[in-house]
Amino acid sequence: IVEAGTPSPWISRLFDEIGHKEIVANPRKLGAIYKSDNKTDERDAEMLARIGRFDPKLLHAIQHSSLKHQRDRKVVDAREALVGVRTKLINYVRSSLKSFGIFLPKGTSAATFAKITKEHLSDKDYLLFESAIQTIAELSERIKEAEKDIDALIEQDYPEALRLQAVAGVG
């Protein structure tokens, strides 16, 4: 019995490869685990074992995605992480500039933020934020590359996603 978590897909595949039957328990469906006030790995493992021995159905077993699907999902996750980092940097620069009384035009897109920011700052002010602004520009390029990778992946392996992208506001 394995508790679902970050390493559980790998552990599940490893058990399959060596011929062991595993149950990947969904801890969110097990109040005895996620509602516990005195959580430890040892107590959780013991509780999973006891429940599994009593009635495995109570573990609400999950089935992990295939390794291919897991890898494909990481392409999307990487893009999401890049967007998150870029957003934090943009918010940092915007709020810092406001403290100097500098306000960027409304509607400045994340993709053009670096260019527009450079156009609206004096050389002296630009130097204060140069590394952040250049990083934002580089992140925007990396995000474009990630989007191309995702589009290629969709076209090659997930054509059903193209239909979702055809609906305005979706995908």
Cite the ranges covered by each PLM segment.
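A detector of single, family-specific signature residues
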Residues: 1-171
